[in-house]
Design a protein with these regions (language model features):
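Extracytoplasmic/secretory soluble proteins
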Residues: 1-469
Length: 469
């Protein structure tokens, strides 16, 4: 079976997957796996082409905060894998909580397998470099305005060759960008933005996101970042590889979401420690909200000739710690060494840019019940917020709602295209809200925004009624 994922093929991929296939055979699973890597920046375009042309493959990765599985379902691209999960998914059902697995269903049928690798209530925090705060005699910011003024001071005093810009792949979706950090400071919180276009609060109110006061506040904050020189001037054309390179080089001060490791920090500050990256929440006393029940998963394309084999492979990964370690960390003694029950030490290869020759992806098919941590190199506060369940967190009432745009197919396609051209530059702060938004909104209305929002509201109200809300 062929498993398609975003990313770059590790140097020792073939060696590791030979071992994986040998173990699959020894365990009698009856599956042989080939993993196909597509560069991240070409992912959407290439995957959509593969799906539309019916190319032969059997499993592909889903990023819910980028393109949710419902989007593929609505194109008729996903296979119903309910039967395969019931028959071959015992380990999946055992290790993925019911409320998360329920988020992978449409009309009671399974169309994806969630990756239970992260606590989704982590959405809304950001990382800050405490070593840089200390070097500049600064306190940790507690408001968006304090964040900007702190960042300005750091930028002015920065001695590195590359400035610690705000860098990301441009969008207008606060969940994808993690600009949801701002939302905790608004009186209307808790709310989330679902499927890029729809504001949903815990009372069940649905609005057009770009027409809310909250969108305007976000855009005005981003405009300040941009005009004060804190945002990368090339923000609208940045590629994911460029964003990653900045983090890997240690040339950053603030990252929305979680990032960093000791080795990357020390490229910028050789004296840095793992405690020099802190997790910050604005208004930490407020509720912690999961916008989605899961962030990543894997789905079987409708044209797959091996749907059961795909489920068997995912189930096998969670059959033992040995299987999981092989898939995620590679060959023990060559790519990593165990460090206690849940620890591991990466073996960096000087002939591979001082990185291990193999590393899997726990965002693609990881599970918190099996994950190992680099106890010397990983960031303790990030580990806690990402990989420990938050017992006080609540799910957004829209977390498991799936929108079907069939009735507004043309309008939905049009607003997606128009928003990329007209809304993203405003949300990223490159254009001024008061000056440019009226014309952009007019274009969105002409593209069919009102009709799409009305259909979303109708379906969400029906969903709420079925939930007994």
């Amino acid at each position: 079976m062929k498993y398609v994922v975003p990313g770059t093929e590790p140097r020792d991929y073939k060696e590791v997957y030979q071992k994986i296939n040998e173990k699959l055979a020894a365990d009698g699973v009856g599956v042989e796996v080939e993993k196909i890597y597509i560069p991240s920046d070409a992912w959407d375009q290439k995957l959509n082409l593969m799906l539309s042309t019916g190319e032969d493959f059997d499993l592909f990765h889903i990023m819910q905060d980028r393109t949710p599985f419902s989007s593929y379902y609505n194109r008729g691209a996903l296979a119903d894998i309910s039967g395969a999960i019931e028959k071959y998914g015992q380990n999946l059902k055992k290790n993925i909580p019911d409320d998360i697995f329920d988020g992978a269903t449409i009309d009671g049928k399974y169309y994806t397998v969630p990756s239970y690798w992260v606590e989704m209530a982590s959405e809304g925090e950001f990382n800050i470099r405490r070593d840089i705060l200390r070097a500049n005699n600064l306190e940790e910011p507690t408001t968006p305005d304090e964040l900007i003024s702190t960042w300005e001071t750091v930028m002015k005093n920065w001695k590195g060759s590359s400035k610690p810009y705000f860098a990301t792949k441009a969008d207008f979706d606060p969940v994808s960008l993690h600009t949801s950090i701002l939302h905790r400071t608004y009186e209307t919180f808790p709310f989330t933005v679902k499927d890029k276009f729809f504001y949903v609060n815990q009372k069940g109110e649905v609005k057009s996101w770009i027409e809310t006061a909250e969108f305007k506040k976000d855009a005005e904050f981003m405009r300040k970042l941009y005009t004060k020189g804190l945002t990368n001037p090339d923000i609208l054309v940045m590629k994911q590889e460029q964003v990653k390179a900045q983090l890997d080089n240690g040339d950053w001060f603030v990252n929305l979401g979680t990032a960093g490791s000791l080795s990357t920090l020390q490229k910028n500050n050789p004296q840095a420690t793992v405690d020099d990256v802190g997790v910050v929440w604005f208004n930490p006393e407020k509720v912690y909200l999961r916008p989605l029940t899961f962030k990543n998963g894997n789905a079987v394309p409708v044209g797959s000739k091996h749907p059961e084999e795909a489920v068997k492979f995912m189930n096998w990964i969670l059959d033992s710690q040995e299987n999981y370690d092989l898939v995620q960390y590679g060959i023990e003694g060559k790519h990593y060494n165990k460090d206690g029950d849940k620890g591991m030490k990466v073996i960096n290869d000087p002939n591979n840019n001082n990185k291990p020759g193999y590393r899997g992806s726990e965002s693609q098919n990881g599970n918190v019940n099996f994950m190992r941590f680099d106890l010397e190199n990983s960031i303790p506060e990030n580990n806690k917020v990402l990989y420990e369940a938050n017992p006080t967190a609540v799910n957004s009432i829209a977390a498991n709602f799936v929108f079907d745009p069939t009735n507004v197919r043309t309008e939905y396609t049009n607003i997606v295209s128009e928003a990329s051209a007209s809304i993203t530059p405003i949300y990223m702060g490159v254009q001024e809200f008061d000056k440019d938004f009226p014309a952009a909104l007019d274009k969105m209305k002409k593209a069919g925004l009102d009709k799409v929002v009305a259909e979303y509201v109708r379906q969400f109200n029906e969903y709420q009624a079925k939930q007994g809300k």
